[in-house]
């Protein structure tokens, strides 16, 4: 094919940058850049933030042989199946030890398992409320239902961890703020801006960098009760 390009050498234009088929979205994106607005990716975790500790390996050396090569510390998507009844338990053991509740997948279903608290690292949001959602789900099509674009997000209470299947949003002091954040990411506005960069199933934090960050408490100019 042949491409013919025209330009006006007497004018200086701004770079096109990110462009969509929707004029409203293009205007919002332009305002974000001009005003330097904080965006949601600043409070989203990366993938695989929880890891197995050296204590877990010291007390259960068989873990290294079971885990994939080079990933001995990963709390991966299949960890419940691999390490069930070794360090992860469906029912909380009654042995006097302190255990951490972990959200993950088993046979493609969401499940909670328990692990000795000494066996898993703790992140800054571990003691806080947070919103978790699948790291990969659906597409970025604006026609997608919320569940197709962002999966089925939920609020996790403090002292609950999660496997690499999920990423988390925020580290909130109270449950109300977390539920307000949940409402926001399910809104058409947030999903539309997410869809600008999310064109595949992958849903890492950098795909959210066009979604404006909001105040999720009572100081917000948004009425979260609606």
Language-model segments: residues:
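C-terminal substrate-recognition regions of SAM-dependent nucleic acid methyltransferases
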Residues: 2-225
